[in-house]
Amino acid sequence: YNLLGFLLDKGLPTYVINPLHTNLYRKSLSLRQTKTDKVDAHTIASMLMSDVNLKSYSDTSYHNEELKSLTRYRFDKVKERAKLKTSISRLVCILFPEIEKLVPTLHQNSVYELLYEFPGAKQIANAHLTRLSNLVETASRGHYTKDTAITFREAAKVSVGSNMPAKSLELKHTIKLIRELDAEIEEIENEIKIIMDEINSPILSIPGISYRMGAMILAEIGDFSQFDSPDKILAYAGMSPSTYQSGQLDNCHSRMEKRGSRYLRYALFNA
């Protein structure tokens, strides 16, 4: 994108072409399987001269890359956090499996606080009741009381969980990493919201479209004027069904093409 930004700053008409298009266009020009830098340059130049409907890349599109970078960065961070949460579930199953039936979900602040301070059934069983009850009450903002702390401790005393210091240390470190990711994701989302407020897109007026999903859709699609029908947007996202027909043979079990942006597919599925 450095070269792209440089060309735009110089006011030069700049075009961005889908590599899939150039590859198919190159194959249509010759039956030979020749691919060199010289051939690629000739193919791109030929496409630019023959495609009268090709639109130049605008400065607005370039700055849209900032939003794309943020939404993709957030996507990767959330995916990383999800893997860590899976690790939490695995470690709890080893150290104190009974707690899963005592709370709505493991992945809440009060449970993380408890497991970070007492990373295992043995530690909870040996904890002083006053300290334990104060911790769960503060971490849950009053939702959990002394009775809850007693329930946790009694369950820990008869737990089948293993006493493994190495796993307890891993659990503490994993919780710490999740907290760090939570803070990073929140910071990224704040930056996304700032850009979305500046754009003021009507996409947010659609029921069910949040800042996060709306931002991802806008970032991946860019300029909606490039698409004159919903079908083209679906094709761009790789959500169109693949089609095979030859003579009287017509495939009846079409699969999604899954070409294009996987981030856009995710956003459209989850919007």
Residue ranges and their predicted role:
Residues 1-271:
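A detector of single, family-specific signature residues
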